[in-house]
Swiss-Prot record:
Subunit structure: Interacts with GSG1.
Residues holding Mg(2+) 1: D114, D116
Reaction(s) catalysed by this chain's protein: RNA(n) + ATP = RNA(n)-3'-adenine ribonucleotide + diphosphate
Start and end residues of each stretch annotated as Disordered: 1-23, 535-555
Originating organism: Homo sapiens
Protein name: Poly(A) polymerase beta
Organism ancestry: Eukaryota, Metazoa, Chordata, Craniata, Vertebrata
């Protein structure tokens, strides 16, 4: 197996028609028509300005860097073998190899993207060797910059910049004396007698390779995935850590679409993607292949056996053993947001099919800051850049807990977090302080039998800050100066914290510079409008708070996810308002319908009532490390 992807785009070739792809029969085996190929070419031209295609020169540079890294690994393993007095016959054939996974291995990486890599070594090479002698060897290379090891991570990794290309290297030691060049990591027998960290490290490569193995046409899959990933980023639903979907989950959804329409080209597959998943009957899982039991006693996703798996709202199951749900972070709110986006994507691609819109419309950014009347702004700050980097990572990883807590409030219909983070204006221009903000849009409802409604968010916010500070202290990461602040702002007050170009209704949207980390206008007045904002400083270990329920557990009783993939009602539903002529578009089976876009959004709109005021009472908190105040906050409708 080659570690480097082939990214050349050749003419699409129809796949040979087997009885079924994946876990069900295809919906349609129709081959593309001239209009479909023309729409695909227009899609490619629309994608180019977004930087989703890498130039050949840059691709060759990546290949050269990986070859150098691969040679370093082989050289290092030979040195380790000699130091451990292995026979010369073994040393000469000991091998060792760098494998790639993620977007680069899938062949859908963008300009300037990093590379996920895996160093595979034989049994006599220890993980400690990887983080000592191999780390030292990398440090001697002139091309290597920003070298750092994260040995205690859930998946231990060495991070570096090699000749200007960011690379994350994982490590796995196999129960083999030598590592052959033609090693296939999809072989389940390789998992025998491995520790859990090696299994986790292997998982990325195994899943990526399995996905490529299970799609009917790799070129069509890649182009479709490029389009869907760009769409997801433009629409702010690309973030596994915040409860949306990450790269591997989007890849599996696209792969399932390719299985259902094995001969379709990218323009058709993009449209079918929205059709399939706007109608998917969640929590039925998305599966690319039937789960297999290997009797290796590894935990696998199975709601029949594991009660916690029954609470997963949008399960997308990895195809490699041990099968896992890649979307366990999805909450009620994030699923609602994504389903609405699927439906809107279906409506737009339907317009494109009828020549009523261009592909560029699909990649227009939604108006997040115009969508809701009420917002919660989370602000994380630290005294130094290094502290800020660690602090922001921890806070961001816990935001989904706050979303899950807010969802349980009977008067909150939706807690929509924007995955983009924004630099916050400085509170004191004379002090060096590093600040980052996240914004959560709130959908609220007002009972009919009440004219005034008080929504107390104190417990939700305080529980969230408790969780963050507790983990920071327990992991010995906490430093004085690390703070979390939460503020409630109405839509018309967002300009106090966010620059105009972020708030304006932008149509054209580029993925370059999306995190906006270069913005920090110190002229913004953080204290403006403080009457209508709430500040919730750090919590302490002395505060007695109940445990938060995971964001994957909703307000309602969980529905048991069955171990079968459904094609929803795609084949059963009939045309309702508008009907597509099957002679005008290939890949549309005669018994298949494209549902008309709903006229009302899937997410409940914000209520008419505005927040009138915020009532606060303050009490002191005593803590050996911190002296802070706690505010109780109510939204008065």
């Amino acid at each position: 197996m080659m570690p480097f992807p082939v990214t050349t785009q050749g003419p699409p070739q129809p796949a040979p028609p087997p009885n079924r792809y994946g876990v069900s029969s295809p919906i349609s085996l129709a081959v593309p028509k001239e209009t479909d190929c023309l729409l695909t070419q227009r899609l490619i031209e629309t994608l180019r300005p977004f930087g989703v295609f890498e130039e050949e020169e840059e691709l060759q540079r990546r290949i050269l860097v990986l070859e150098k890294l691969n040679n370093l690994v082989k050289e290092w393993i030979r040195e380790i073998s000699e130091s451990k007095s292995l026979p010369q016959s073994v040393i000469e054939n000991v091998g060792g190899k760098i494998f790639t996974f993620g977007s680069y291995r899938l062949g859908v990486h963008t300009k300037g993207a990093d590379i996920d890599a895996l160093c595979v070594a034989p049994s006599h090479v220890d993980r400690s060797d990887f983080f000592t002698s191999f780390y030292a060897k990398l440090k001697l290379q002139e091309e290597v910059k920003d070298l750092r090891a994260v040995e205690e991570a859930f998946v231990p990794v060495i991070k570096l910049c090699f000749d200007g290309i960011e690379i994350d290297i994982l490590f796995a030691r196999l129960a083999l004396q030598t590592i052959p060049e033609d090693l296939d990591l999809r072989d389940d027998s390789l998992l025998k007698n491995l520790d859990i960290r090696c299994i986790r490290s292997l998982n990325g490569c195994r899943v990526t390779d399995e996905i490529l193995h299970l799609v009917p046409n790799i070129d069509n899959f890649r182009l479709t995935l490029r389009a869907i990933k760009l769409w997801a980023k433009c629409h702010n639903i690309y973030s596994n850590i915040l409860g949306f979907l990450g790269g591997v989950s989007w890849a599996m959804l696209v792969a399932r679409t390719c299985q259902l329409y094995p001969n379709a080209v990218a323009s058709t597959l993009v449209r079918k993607f929205f059709l399939v998943f706007s109608e998917w009957e969640w929590p039925n899982p998305v599966l690319l292949k039937e789960p297999e039991e290997r009797n290796l006693n590894l935990p696998v996703w199975d709601p029949r056996v594991n009660p916690s798996d029954r609470y997963h709202l949008m399960p997308i199951i990895t195809p490699a053993y041990p099968q896992q749900n890649s979307t366990y972070n999805v909450s009620i709110s994030t699923r609602m947001v994504m389903i609405e986006e699927f439906k809107q994507g279906l409506a737009i691609t339907h317009e494109i099919l009828l020549s009523k819109a261009e592909w560029s419309k699909l990649f227009e950014a939604p108006s997040f800051f115009q969508k809701y009347k009420h917002y919660i702004v989370l602000l994380a700050s630290a005294s130094t850049e290094k502290q800020h980097l660690e602090w922001v990572g921890l806070v961001e990883s816990k935001i989904r807990i706050l979303v899950g807590s807010l969802e349980k409030n009977e008067f909150i219909t939706l807690a929509h977090v924007n995955p983009q983070s924004f630099p916050a204006p400085k509170e004191n221009p004379d002090m060096e302080e590093f600040r980052t903000m996240w914004v959560i849009g709130l959908g609220l409802k007002k009972p009919d039998n009440s004219e005034i409604l008080s929504i107390d968010l104190t417990y939700d916010i305080q529980s969230f800050t408790d969780t963050v500070y507790r983990q920071a202290v327990n992991s010995k990461m906490f430093e004085m100066g690390m703070k979390i602040t939460a503020m409630h702002l109405r839509r018309k007050e967002l300009h106090q914290l966010l620059p105009h170009h972020v708030l304006q209704d932008k149509k054209a949207h580029s993925t370059e510079g999306r995190r906006l980390t270069d913005l920090n206008d110190s002229s913004f007045d953080l204290s403006a409008g403080c009457e209508n904002s709430m500040s919730v400083p750090s919590s302490t270990s002395t505060m007695k708070t109940g445990p938060l329920i995971s964001s994957s557990q909703g307000r309602n009783s969980p529905a048991l996810a069955v171990m079968t993939a459904s094609v929803a009602n795609i084949q059963a539903t009939e045309f309702s308002l508008q009907q597509v002529n099957t002679n005008e578009s290939s890949g549309v089976a005669l018994n298949e319908s494209i549902p008309h876009a709903v006229s009302q959004p899937a997410i409940s709109p914000s209520p008419k009532a505005m927040v009138a005021r915020v009532v606060s009472s303050t009490c002191l908190i005593s803590h050996p490390d911190l002296q802070e105040t706690q505010q109780q906050t109510y939204l008065i409708l």
